[in-house]
Design a protein with these regions (language model features):
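Helical "lid/coupling" subdomains associated with nucleotide-phosphate turnover
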Residues: 1-168, 174-187, 192-195
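Short, non-transmembrane amphipathic alpha-helical segments
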Residues: 196-208
Length: 208
């Protein structure tokens, strides 16, 4: 077999390498080119395994993407990749509830960082884990491990979307306008809606 490979590709020599490709990585890359991304299948399997509330995940995905489009136009070459990661984060951010409701975001982040997730590189998993970790609770833990602006962009979108859908019901949200500023984001929400949603308004105040 090796002789045939050398002949077919006109190879002259072979050099030993201490590195190795992860099992299945070539099939994974080939699948992405043919629009059969293994990562999508993995995310769907995790949602089923950890009994994710799919309606809530869909609500948050929709709102998080709407926020992202205000901060990163769809014609930006980075948009597709960032949007894809945001969708995965929105679908998986509650998998830790299967472990415990308390600090579930930490459990979600741990599972994502350490589980076997076919199609995802360890770097991808680490990034996804940080975004999920940052969607809730204090941000100091995330600040200690990343200063990457694009990750904070996704954290902001996921965090705000989760906050707006804290009631976990289908309801019409107000228009939300966001812009990126030098050291964070500027948020504008309809005052009448905030007055009618005092609990959400209080949580938003805590975020400022």
């Amino acid at each position: 077999i090796m002789a045939a490979i050398f002949k077919e590709f006109e190879l002259q020599r072979m050099v030993f390498s201490e590195g190795a490709l992860r099992l299945g990585v070539l099939y994974d890359l080939l699948g992405r080119y043919h629009h059969d991304d293994l990562r999508e299948a993995t995310v769907s399997q995790f949602m089923q395994r950890y009994a994710v509330d799919r309606r809530q995940a869909a609500r948050i995905t929709h709102s998080a993407l709407a926020l992202l489009r205000q901060l990163l136009p769809e014609d930006d070459p980075r948009y597709e990749t960032e949007a894809q990661f945001l969708v995965w984060a929105a679908r998986l951010h509650e998998i830790g509830i299967s472990v415990a409701h308390a600090s579930y975001h930490k459990h979600s982040a741990y599972i994502i960082a350490n589980a076997d997730m076919p199609g995802f590189s360890r770097m991808d998993q680490s990034r996804l884990s940080r975004v999920v970790l940052g969607h809730r609770g204090k941000l100091e833990r995330v600040q200690a491990v990343t200063s990457e602006p694009r990750e904070w962009l996704l954290i902001f979108c996921l965090r705000l979307a989760a906050l707006l859908h804290r009631a976990r019901v289908d309801t019409e949200l107000p228009e939300v306008h966001v812009i990126a500023v030098e050291r964070g984001f500027h948020l504008s929400v309809d005052g009448a809606w905030l007055a009618a949603s005092p609990l959400t308004a209080a949580v938003l105040d805590e975020e400022v």
